[in-house]
Regions:
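Glycine-rich, low-complexity segments
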Residues: 1-31
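Acidic/proline-rich low-complexity IDRs
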Residues: 2, 40-43, 94
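Ser/Thr-centric signal marking residues that sit
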Residues: 4, 45, 49, 131
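Local beta-strand/beta-hairpin segments that build beta-sheet-rich folds
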Residues: 18-19, 39-44, 84-86
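Terminal beta-strand-rich extracellular "head" domains
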Residues: 24-25, 31-36, 50-129, 133-171
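Glycine-rich, charged/polar anion/phosphate-binding loops
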Residues: 41-46, 116-118
Length: 171
């Protein structure tokens, strides 16, 4: 990593240098209601305090779970409560959707794991925290299970973990 001293006594990082990574890993198995508005996806939220000015943030989400009637369900990422890198058209626009792993509706024993990421350009200020969170919405109210399938009465049904990884990259 190339570092140079600047007049203010701070450090100037070369563009593209990874400055830090923060992670949330959750094993909590819980259901939630998905509505037509963005709702936080399980416990996938994290604040990061920038080490650099005007940094970029690579935000990666790995979600494990199952959604009742998963069609029309959209996953997105918010920064300080606002969706990032997606058309502002609202409901129906998505960075990702649940991955169908079965050829028919199966709201019982088939997880729909999803991975998605985006690189967010910011006007970050050193020391001023930014909060990222994974969010979910749908065209109608439905139930979503985090880190498990709907059914968990035997070891035949899958369980997993979910993760939010945020990497700050010097801008």
């Amino acid at each position: 990593m190339a570092l140079t001293k600047v007049n203010s006594g701070g450090i100037n990082f070369s563009t593209g240098t990874i400055l830090q990574t923060v992670i949330v890993l959750t094993t909590t198995q819980a259901s939630q209601t998905v509505t037509t508005s963005d709702t936080q996806l399980g416990l996938l939220t994290k604040a990061i305090t920038p080490l650099g000015a005007n940094s970029k943030f690579l935000v990666y989400v790995r979600w494990f779970g199952e959604v009742g009637s998963s069609h029309n369900v959209c996953f997105n990422i918010q920064m300080n409560g606002t969706r990032v890198n997606i058309n502002s058209g609202g409901r129906g626009y998505a960075l990702a959707m649940p991955l169908r792993t079965y050829d028919a509706v199966n709201d019982s024993s088939t997880p729909e794991p999803t991975n998605f990421q985006t690189l967010v350009s910011t006007s970050s200020v050193i020391g001023t925290a930014i909060t990222f969170r994974a969010v979910v919405d749908s065209n109608s109210s439905r139930t979503l299970w985090n880190n498990r399938c709907f059914a968990t009465t035997s070891t035949d049904y899958e369980r997993g973990t979910s993760e939010l990884i945020i990497t700050e990259v010097a801008g």
